[in-house]
Amino acid sequence: MADLHAVTAITLDLDDTLWPVRPTLVAAEKVLAQWLRTHAPATAQGTPPPLMLALRAEVAAEHPQWAHDLSAIRLETIRRALRRHGDDPALAELAFEVFFDARHAVALYDDVRPGLARLAARYRLIAVSNGNAEVDRVGLGEFFSGSVSARLHGVAKPDPSIFRAACAAAGAAPHQVLHLGDDLDTDVDGALAAGLHAGWICRPDGAHASAEPRAGAHRFTDLLDVAAALGI
């Protein structure tokens, strides 16, 4: 396992690394459903959250070119639901914004804000996400120097190019960058394949807590653990 003395920048995944994403999305689906009950009642009645999720899977299967763009999939899902039930499909953009706003009402893990503060005091931090969350909208923008999203980059992790783009945003070579994330495949394997250091954020109560870490990767319980390992 490589040591971290050469690290000058840190890239971080967002969903399930800085906050649990499932409860956030479930709550956002409920907010969207409530909005639809007021503005598009036929759609709300005909497409409750479980059916909306099924429709979303249908749209994703029909549009593989959007695999890296969750916003495009969500918007088309809402538009299709409105059209199927005779409501105005032009409402889709407004409905999406309602969902997107609620999607950013995240509950940060307790270590995130103090951990980011310690890391940002020494390193440039770059967000790298396959999702559509934005660090400014979740109130963490002050800690980050930039972000690279799969939606804007055009491909998702674990593709090496998105990690290289994050390194460029940080102004550092891959061997100078530590990537932190919860997913062994997209975050850890992806970072290692792109030449970065990889830090697996494996929270004790997380879904992957019993999994074996990858060879060559560092294992951390949270961001404060990362800061301690880096001597800050």
Regions found by a protein language model. Give the residues of each.
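Asp-based, Mg2+/Mn2+-dependent phosphohydrolase catalytic module
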Residues: 1-10, 22-23, 87, 113-117, ...
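N-terminal helical cap/lid subdomain that shapes the substrate entry/recognition surface
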Residues: 3-110
